[in-house]
């Protein structure tokens, strides 16, 4: 590889080699010798007196090249004229000193040595080739055991290990020549050299056909794959054992003299010295015919020293230097954050850059930034020099330099010229998304701080409390062009994550705009009428009218036809001011701002202006409202005072009331009416409710409008204005200042029962203060952890998606996914219009029930179309998606849809993968790190009923109910749903009904808003009798499977099912309650099965043995704790868990087929559940469930494919296998979105789809057909299709496979590009594997191109590559045409000549 990339040493200006791919493979000894310029024989480095390299040493000039340019070591030949000559005295070639960076040497080893990467990197490649375990290999290599290489006619077998004694005995028994056995790396080399790859592969294929069981085929496939990769790549197995070691060029492992006669050296020199020393000693020992044991020891030491050189610390103890620090080996040079890949190739330092503190620059325009003069002078030096020379102010660069250093006046004039129209890039670390680097035009300022426009702060996430930013200068014309056209801050108005404007006023500006658009009664000038804006301004200035007075005024508007019309409005002077700034457009009417504007409203205004009035107008508008906001906030003089925090007068009444309640609960607990857990829940519940009521009372007090004696409305409370407008602060912060602080959490996440009743204004008691320190500290440590975790998630996401680029306009696929509104707990959290906006329709969208097309197939759905779809009441739309795109290497534009940051169809070459990764990763720091334990936490108080949110009629789905003795309807199904339908039949809301819920409505009932529809017990899960009869206990034996719990305080006894498996003779028991009739015969259900209720551990029995029961009675209750003690993983860990596709701990079991449930014979501690398929052609499916787990299905229940047989979180792999790709994508998107929605972060679904697409790139082969693919192997989708296409062309049987879901880390490591994978994680493993397979990296992704130092194949880089490709094709055509013409001409001239000669001339 080095040779391929190295430049020609004789010609210093040789052009860099153009290459299309990089291949990595094992180096044969011959190749190593071919690279080498000589053998390093001595461990010496430099003569410390003369500082000249020792001959034949590690820095030898004869091998590696001269120390000074064009000068040999002894100084006989100097200067250019002797170039290329080899000095006969010192043997040094006269050439550039630079060749010492590229010439390699070698060491001839006296004994072969196994390469540690191929030995120890799991799975061990040498071990696989020889079919030996790693332990056996090490025994041979480190001279403990002999191995039989050629058994001859003896009873020994090939590959058998022999101890020293056994070996000697065998020699005595069979004679010394009857068999061959050897020890050490020689033995292994010999065995590897004897392998016939083709024959081995053939034999393995035969074995694979006959192999049965689970593990054997897997093992054979592993060996077969490695044997085949050796065959294909042309590598030989024995090359994994080294006989020659390359020595890297000396300039790459420098030795630098420090003052005081000491040297600073690279660790590699120490490691090489060790190898050379031991190698020379071994040579001498062999020459001296030393005893075997000594030679062996020396060989072992040589093996160890070579191991340390390649990968120190991988085997045995770490070799340390003189200061007890481990030496950095060749592997360590590549690995980790400080390794070559991540430190120097992916993260380079940049020239022409500077950094400084930022301050706010409110008088800048949006596309400008203030650059300190000093910085600009330094950054633009070369430009200034050339301009000075061009103007004749200096004749040489040296002179120009002097002028600049003295800072003469003419230099400043020139700096102004240079800087004009030359954008610079500003970057703030951490750059979490692409808006973290934007281009601005510099404006020269005095001082030393960079001025930043306030509106771009939110994109950079910058504030002015000492943040620093870096400035970079784009040098070439192309770079300046890209900076201006693509990166200018004015082009980044919309966020790529969700398409909403990101240039939005914040803080003071919001407050100013809120204050401007306020309207108050009874202000001065109320009811006046004005003819024009100028008149209003005049009146304001003279004090005749107040900013908030309600007035009537005329304002010119644009109507639908684009004509100007004067319209009258009821408004306030403040709103008129704002309205005057709106661009004149029919789509941006004055009504847009004729109301009280909060932060969200301002964002909508900007969005509307951007969509309909274009970029230029909206940028000007943003700048103007920023100015207005700052100005008005300053004039309003809104400030924050202690008295602005109002403590509600009713607070103490509410607190006392709650304290009484808590006392009652304590008493109930002492009386034994409730358990400790229930008491805890109720207390926490009560305090949360109290907290909410105090907060409501405070908000009522604080937001109430007050009037003065003249009846004029007073200004609202200033703190309320800040919070309400969205400028700063929130209700919860106000609650802590003026209400009560409320409940606090312990460090482990549990809630402390006693709340903090005081607020900050009143001051906390010592105890309260102590209780609140827990949470506060946890918050701080969480934040630190969160940042690191979030960054790591982003890194993994970027790595998995980096090669996902828009490659073509249309892939022509027929596949699509269905989009529908997202509903959570009966609430529509994101409407259909939001989910289809910016997507491409996969088929015509029609108005329901009519033949009217809203959107044509392959048409982009914009805002207007989305609203039409919503208005027409369409329920779901088939849209194209990145998941179903069929492009090779990337996605097509139609499947992706709109580029959210531009608002138009995405361009070819856009790096959508990276944008997706950034959009998901960037808000990561806002997510929580907490895992919620529901160890009885009242999460906002457990809900126990649901009331109708809309009015409509009730409709049930999968109805299965039962009337109990009191005439109440009880839900008996697990997948019954209640829908509320509108008059037109649209579903307004839908609720999942829990088993055992009581229904208050019937099918077809009309419900009003707020009407209670159904309720359930939030703390227990009931088991309900479906038939009347007598309850009979089975295997419910007191003391073995049932314990009687008597509460001391109350004397009440409950029967509770215990874990019967732990009891002696308990394993055979199947505790259940059956229902029998009066004669003791089991009552049967509709399917004819006996009615039985298996009991799970911790269930509380509600009926006695032999008690008569009616249908609908509760037989037993399972505490919800038991049914639901799983932690709810929230926030970042949940997102990571989903993208890593981890199986949840207690994952749900999902039915794979439609059929009937049967309970089979039980195992020791597992229950067997079978599903008998409804379709007779299918096989029954069996599942094992731990005994004592609650199973929600009964014998004979009909389940549908995809139903849960056991509760829990489903494993994403199961969803993919059973329900398919679309269901998996829906699940992942919904789950990820739920986490982000909780934090109020909006991310477009398509970003998650892109990542899921990348997780589904591999296919597992189920049947290999006639292809060379192996069963059970994971291959890339493209490879799979290529292989099948080849076989189809030959008419053979195609391979079949199913998609596999890989977590993002695994998917990144299994990418086709080994360079990208190696720079991500597990560098050694990736490179080892790639070398054995002789992999070629085609350089298609972004990362590999950055690493080899080319333009990335995305954006403008992709465009130039495309143009170049087209040009080459055209040239090729022209050349072909000319050749054809020439041949035709030649044929005309010499028709009697043989055609062979014509071809020869060419």
From Swiss-Prot:
<keyword id="KW-0240">DNA-directed RNA polymerase</keyword>
<comment type="subunit">
    <text>The RNAP catalytic core consists of 2 alpha, 1 beta, 1 beta' and 1 omega subunit. When a sigma factor is associated with the core the holoenzyme is formed, which can initiate transcription.</text>
</comment>
<dbReference type="InterPro" id="IPR038120">
    <property type="entry name" value="Rpb1_funnel_sf"/>
</dbReference>
<feature type="binding site">
    <location>
        <position position="72"/>
    </location>
    <ligand>
        <name>Zn(2+) 1</name>
    </ligand>
</feature>
<dbReference type="Pfam" id="PF04997">
    <property type="entry name" value="RNA_pol_Rpb1_1"/>
</dbReference>
<feature type="binding site">
    <location>
        <position position="467"/>
    </location>
    <ligand>
        <name>Mg(2+)</name>
    </ligand>
</feature>
<keyword id="KW-0460">Magnesium</keyword>
<dbReference type="InterPro" id="IPR042102">
    <property type="entry name" value="RNA_pol_Rpb1_3_sf"/>
</dbReference>
<feature type="binding site">
    <location>
        <position position="90"/>
    </location>
    <ligand>
        <name>Zn(2+) 1</name>
    </ligand>
</feature>
<keyword id="KW-0548">Nucleotidyltransferase</keyword>
<dbReference type="InterPro" id="IPR007080">
    <property type="entry name" value="RNA_pol_Rpb1_1"/>
</dbReference>
<keyword id="KW-0479">Metal-binding</keyword>
<keyword id="KW-0804">Transcription</keyword>
<feature type="binding site">
    <location>
        <position position="87"/>
    </location>
    <ligand>
        <name>Zn(2+) 1</name>
    </ligand>
</feature>
<feature type="binding site">
    <location>
        <position position="892"/>
    </location>
    <ligand>
        <name>Zn(2+) 2</name>
    </ligand>
</feature>
<feature type="binding site">
    <location>
        <position position="811"/>
    </location>
    <ligand>
        <name>Zn(2+) 2</name>
    </ligand>
</feature>
<feature type="binding site">
    <location>
        <position position="463"/>
    </location>
    <ligand>
        <name>Mg(2+)</name>
    </ligand>
</feature>
<dbReference type="GO" id="GO:0000428">
    <property type="term" value="C:DNA-directed RNA polymerase complex"/>
</dbReference>
<dbReference type="Pfam" id="PF04983">
    <property type="entry name" value="RNA_pol_Rpb1_3"/>
</dbReference>
<dbReference type="GO" id="GO:0003899">
    <property type="term" value="F:DNA-directed RNA polymerase activity"/>
</dbReference>
<dbReference type="InterPro" id="IPR007083">
    <property type="entry name" value="RNA_pol_Rpb1_4"/>
</dbReference>
<dbReference type="InterPro" id="IPR007081">
    <property type="entry name" value="RNA_pol_Rpb1_5"/>
</dbReference>
<feature type="binding site">
    <location>
        <position position="885"/>
    </location>
    <ligand>
        <name>Zn(2+) 2</name>
    </ligand>
</feature>
<dbReference type="InterPro" id="IPR044893">
    <property type="entry name" value="RNA_pol_Rpb1_clamp_domain"/>
</dbReference>
<dbReference type="Pfam" id="PF04998">
    <property type="entry name" value="RNA_pol_Rpb1_5"/>
</dbReference>
<comment type="similarity">
    <text>Belongs to the RNA polymerase beta' chain family.</text>
</comment>
<keyword id="KW-0862">Zinc</keyword>
<dbReference type="GO" id="GO:0008270">
    <property type="term" value="F:zinc ion binding"/>
</dbReference>
<dbReference type="InterPro" id="IPR045867">
    <property type="entry name" value="DNA-dir_RpoC_beta_prime"/>
</dbReference>
<feature type="binding site">
    <location>
        <position position="895"/>
    </location>
    <ligand>
        <name>Zn(2+) 2</name>
    </ligand>
</feature>
<dbReference type="GO" id="GO:0003677">
    <property type="term" value="F:DNA binding"/>
</dbReference>
<feature type="binding site">
    <location>
        <position position="465"/>
    </location>
    <ligand>
        <name>Mg(2+)</name>
    </ligand>
</feature>
<keyword id="KW-0808">Transferase</keyword>
<dbReference type="GO" id="GO:0006351">
    <property type="term" value="P:DNA-templated transcription"/>
</dbReference>
<comment type="function">
    <text>DNA-dependent RNA polymerase catalyzes the transcription of DNA into RNA using the four ribonucleoside triphosphates as substrates.</text>
</comment>
<feature type="binding site">
    <location>
        <position position="74"/>
    </location>
    <ligand>
        <name>Zn(2+) 1</name>
    </ligand>
</feature>
<dbReference type="InterPro" id="IPR007066">
    <property type="entry name" value="RNA_pol_Rpb1_3"/>
</dbReference>
<dbReference type="GO" id="GO:0000287">
    <property type="term" value="F:magnesium ion binding"/>
</dbReference>
<protein>
    <recommendedName>
        <fullName>DNA-directed RNA polymerase subunit beta'</fullName>
        <ecNumber>2.7.7.6</ecNumber>
    </recommendedName>
</protein>
<dbReference type="Pfam" id="PF05000">
    <property type="entry name" value="RNA_pol_Rpb1_4"/>
</dbReference>
<dbReference type="Pfam" id="PF00623">
    <property type="entry name" value="RNA_pol_Rpb1_2"/>
</dbReference>
<dbReference type="InterPro" id="IPR000722">
    <property type="entry name" value="RNA_pol_asu"/>
</dbReference>
């Amino acid at each position: 590889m080095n040779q391929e990339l190295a430049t020609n040493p004789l010609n210093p200006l040789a052009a860099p080699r153009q290459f299309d791919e990089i291949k990595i493979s094992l180096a044969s000894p011959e190749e190593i010798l071919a690279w080498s310029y000589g053998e390093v024989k001595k461990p010496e480095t430099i003569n410390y007196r003369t500082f000249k390299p020792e001959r034949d040493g590690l820095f030898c000039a004869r091998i590696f090249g001269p120390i000074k340019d064009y000068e040999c070591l002894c100084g006989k030949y100097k200067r250019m004229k002797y170039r290329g000559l080899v000095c006969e005295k010192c043997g040094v070639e006269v050439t550039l000193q630079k060749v010492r960076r590229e010439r390699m040497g070698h060491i001839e080893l006296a004994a072969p040595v196994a390469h540690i990467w191929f030995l120890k990197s799991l799975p061990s490649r040498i071990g696989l080739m020889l079919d030996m375990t790693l332990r056996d290999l090490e025994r041979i290599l480190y001279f403990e055991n002999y191995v039989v290489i050629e058994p001859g006619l003896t009873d020994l077998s090939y590959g058998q290990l022999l101890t020293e004694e056994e070996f000697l005995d065998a020699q005595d028994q069979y004679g010394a020549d009857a068999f061959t056995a050897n020890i050490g790396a020689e033995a292994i080399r010999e065995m590897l050299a004897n392998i016939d790859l083709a024959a081995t592969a053939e034999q393995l294929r035969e074995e694979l056909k006959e192999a049965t069981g689970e593990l054997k085929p897997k093992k054979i496939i592993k060996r077969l794959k490695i044997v085949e990769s050796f065959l294909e790549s042309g590598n030989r197995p024995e090359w994994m054992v080294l006989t020659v070691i390359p020595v890297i060029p000396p300039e790459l492992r420098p030795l630098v003299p420090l003052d005081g006669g000491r040297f600073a050296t690279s660790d590699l020199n120490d490691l090489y010295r060790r190898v050379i020393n031991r190698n020379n000693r071994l040579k001498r020992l062999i020459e001296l015919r030393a005893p075997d044991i000594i030679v062996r020891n020396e060989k072992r030491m040589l093996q160890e020293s070579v191991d340390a050189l390649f990968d120190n610390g991988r085997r045995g103890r770490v070799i340390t230097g003189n200061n007890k620090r481990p030496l950095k080996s060749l592997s360590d040079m590549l690995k980790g954050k400080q390794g070559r890949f991540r430190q120097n190739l992916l993260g380079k330092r940049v020239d022409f850059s500077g950094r400084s503190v930022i301050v706010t620059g409110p008088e800048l325009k949006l596309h400008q930034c203030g650059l300190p003069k000093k910085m600009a002078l330094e950054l633009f030096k070369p430009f200034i020099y050339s301009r000075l020379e061009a103007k004749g102010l200096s004749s040489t660069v040296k002179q120009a330099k002097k002028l600049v250093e003295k800072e003469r006046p003419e230099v400043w004039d020139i700096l102004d010229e240079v800087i004009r129209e030359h954008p610079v890039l500003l970057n703030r670390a951490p750059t979490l998304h692409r808006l973290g680097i934007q281009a601005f035009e510099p404006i020269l300022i005095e001082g030393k701080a960079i001025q930043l426009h306030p509106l771009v702060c939110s994109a950079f996430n910058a504030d002015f409390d000492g943040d620093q930013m870096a400035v970079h200068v784009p040098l070439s014309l192309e770079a300046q062009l890209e900076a201006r056209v693509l990166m200018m801050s004015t082009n980044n108005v919309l966020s790529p994550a969700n398409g909403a404007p990101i240039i939005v006023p914040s803080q003071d500006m919001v407050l100013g705009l809120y204050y401007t658009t306020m309207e108050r009664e009874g202000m001065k000038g109320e009811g006046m009428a004005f003819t024009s804006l100028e008149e209003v301004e005049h009146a304001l200035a003279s004090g005749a009218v107040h900013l908030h007075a309600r007035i009537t005024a005329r304002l010119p508007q644009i109507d639908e036809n684009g004509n100007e019309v004067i319209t009258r409005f009821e408004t306030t002077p403040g709103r008129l001011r704002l309205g005057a700034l709106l661009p004149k457009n029919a789509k941006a009417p004055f009504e847009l701002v004729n109301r009280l504007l909060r932060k969200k409203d301002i964002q909508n205004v900007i969005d509307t202006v951007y969509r309909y009035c274009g970029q230029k107008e909206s940028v000007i508008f943003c700048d103007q409202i920023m100015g207005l906001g700052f100005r008005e906030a300053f004039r309003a003089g809104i400030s924050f005072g202690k008295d602005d925090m109002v403590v509600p007068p009713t607070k103490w009444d509410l607190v006392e009331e709650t304290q009484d309640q808590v006392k009652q609960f304590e008493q109930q607990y002492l009386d034994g009416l409730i358990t400790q857990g229930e008491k805890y829940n109720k207390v926490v519940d009560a305090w949360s409710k109290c907290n909410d009521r105090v907060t409501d009372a405070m908000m009522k007090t604080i937001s109430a409008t007050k009037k003065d004696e003249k009846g004029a409305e007073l200004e609202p409370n200033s703190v309320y204005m800040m919070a309400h407008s969205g400028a700063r602060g929130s209700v919860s912060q106000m609650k802590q200042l003026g209400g009560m602080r409320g409940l606090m959490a312990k460090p482990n996440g549990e809630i402390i029962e006693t709340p903090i009743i005081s607020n900050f204004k009143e001051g906390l008691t010592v105890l309260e203060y102590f209780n609140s320190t827990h949470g506060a500290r946890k918050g701080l440590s969480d934040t630190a952890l969160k940042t690191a975790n979030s960054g790591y998630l982003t890194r993994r996401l970027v790595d998995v998606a980096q090669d996902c680029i828009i490659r073509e306009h249309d892939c022509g696929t027929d596949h699509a996914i269905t989009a529908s509104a997202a509903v959570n707990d009966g609430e529509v959290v994101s409407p259909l219009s939001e989910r289809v906006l910016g997507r491409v329709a996969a088929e015509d969208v029609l108005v329901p029930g009519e033949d009217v097309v809203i959107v044509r197939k392959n048409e982009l759905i914009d805002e207007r179309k989305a609203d039409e779809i919503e208005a027409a009441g369409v329920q779901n739309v088939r849209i194209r998606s990145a998941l179903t795109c069929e492009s090779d290497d990337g996605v097509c534009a139609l499947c992706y849809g709109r580029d959210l940051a531009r608002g138009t169809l995405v361009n070819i070459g856009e790096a959508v993968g990276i944008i997706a990764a950034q959009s998901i990763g960037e808000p990561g720091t806002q997510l929580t790190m907490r895992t919620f334990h529901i160890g009885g936490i009242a999460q906002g108080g457990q809900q126990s009923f649901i009331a109708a949110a809309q009015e409509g009629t009730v409709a049930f789905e999968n109805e299965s109910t039962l009337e109990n003795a009191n005439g109440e309807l009880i839900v008996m199904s697990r997948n019954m749903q209640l829908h509320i339908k509108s008059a037109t039949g649209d579903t307004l809301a839908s609720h999942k009904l829990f088993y055992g819920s009581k229904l208050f409505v019937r099918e077809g009932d009309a419900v009003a808003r707020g009407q209670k529809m159904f309720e359930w017990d939030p703390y227990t899960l009931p088991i309900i009798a479906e038939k009347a009869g007598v309850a009979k206990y089975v295997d419910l034996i007191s003391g073995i499977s049932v314990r009687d719990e008597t509460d001391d305080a109350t004397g009440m006894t409950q029967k509770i099912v215990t874990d019967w498996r732990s009891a002696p003779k308990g394993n055979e028991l199947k505790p259940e309650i059956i229902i029998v009739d009066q004669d003791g015969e089991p009552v049967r259900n509709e399917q004819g099965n006996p009615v039985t209720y298996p009991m799970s551990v911790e269930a509380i029995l509600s009926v006695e043995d032999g008690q008569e029961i009616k249908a609908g009675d509760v037989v037993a209750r399972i505490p919800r704790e038991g049914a639901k003690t799983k932690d709810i993983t929230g926030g970042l860990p949940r997102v990571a868990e989903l993208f890593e596709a981890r199986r949840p701990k207690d994952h749900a079991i999902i039915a794979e087929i439609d059929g009937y449930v049967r309970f089979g014979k039980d195992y020791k501690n597992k229950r067997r559940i079978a599903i008998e398929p409804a379709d007779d052609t299918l096989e029954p499916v069996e599942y094992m469930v731990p005994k004592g787990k609650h199973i929600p299905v009964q014998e004979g229940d009909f389940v549908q494919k995809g139903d849960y047989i056991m509760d829990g979180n489903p494993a994403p792999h199961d969803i993919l296998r059973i329900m398919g790709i679309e269901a998996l994508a829906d699940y992942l998107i919904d789950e990820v979105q739920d986490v982000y929605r909780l934090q109020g972060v909006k991310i477009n679904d398509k970003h998650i789809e892109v990542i899921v697409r990348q997780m589904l790139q591999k296919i597992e082969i189920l049947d290999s057909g006639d292809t060379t693919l192996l069963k059970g192997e994971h291959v890339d989708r493209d490879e799979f299709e290529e292989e099948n296409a080849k076989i189809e062309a030959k008419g053979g049987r195609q391979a079949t496979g199913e998609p596999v879901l890989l977590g993002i880390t695994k998917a990144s490591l299994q990418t086709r590009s080994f360079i990208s994978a190696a720079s991500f994680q597990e560098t050694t493993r990736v490179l080892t594997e790639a070398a054995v397979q002789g992999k070629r990296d085609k350089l298609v992704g972004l990362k590999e191109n950055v690493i080899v130092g080319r333009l990335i194949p995305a954006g403008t880089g992709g465009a130039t590559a495309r143009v170049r490709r087209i040009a080459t094709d055209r040239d090729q055509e022209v050349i072909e045409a000319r050749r054809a013409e020439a041949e035709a001409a030649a044929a005309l001239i010499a028709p009697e000549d043989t055609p062979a000669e014509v071809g020869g001339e060419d």
